[in-house]
Amino acid sequence: MNHIALFEPRIHFNTGNIARTCAATNTVLHLIEPFGFEISDKHLKRAGLDYWDKVNIVYHKNLQDFMNSIADGGQLYLVSKFAEHVYSDVDYSDDKKDHYFLFGREDTGLPEEFMHEHRDECIRIPMNDEHVRSLNLSNCACMIVYEALKQQEFRGLELVHTYEKDKLK
């Protein structure tokens, strides 16, 4: 199973987009406190997150709480622009294994000491950083979870939809 973990997310729109991706891909969403926004019915409705109840969300009080929750045999990946390993070069094909993709705060990323402790688990998305400091968090989460799903042959997802008024027929 795939898991996306957000360390102290600051921007509710990113978290909402990632939650939608998780709902669409049967991916577990881990939210690590504190947040830079309020999670309440009022705020969720205003953001149009009417699918929030369809997302498997696990809340964690802090990073250590999240680390303690990783299933035996689970694989942790820290997503960072500072990593050496490219995300698409990693083997995620075992869909029986728990793959945890941990993303840092939008403004400061993951704690540096924590990254050093897990240097071998760090992965990156290649980019030209001469002109751009970083990629959007929700885009990154989507890219990485879909790479994992591609390698897992999209098991558990519908590959073809049938609609009453199919625009392609």
Curated annotation (Swiss-Prot):
Entry EC number(s): 2.1.1.207
Residues reported in the UniProt entry to bind S-adenosyl-L-methionine: 79, 104, 125, 134
Protein localization: Cytoplasm
Enzyme class name: transferase
Reactions performed catalytically: cytidine(34) in tRNA + S-adenosyl-L-methionine = 2'-O-methylcytidine(34) in tRNA + S-adenosyl-L-homocysteine + H(+); 5-carboxymethylaminomethyluridine(34) in tRNA(Leu) + S-adenosyl-L-methionine = 5-carboxymethylaminomethyl-2'-O-methyluridine(34) in tRNA(Leu) + S-adenosyl-L-homocysteine + H(+)
Example GO molecular function: tRNA (5-carboxymethylaminomethyluridine(34)-2'-O)-methyltransferase activity
Record keywords, A-Z: Cytoplasm, Methyltransferase, S-adenosyl-L-methionine, Transferase, tRNA processing
Role description: Could methylate the ribose at the nucleotide 34 wobble position in tRNA.
Protein name (database record): Putative tRNA (cytidine(34)-2'-O)-methyltransferase
Annotated source species: Lactococcus lactis subsp. cremoris (strain MG1363)
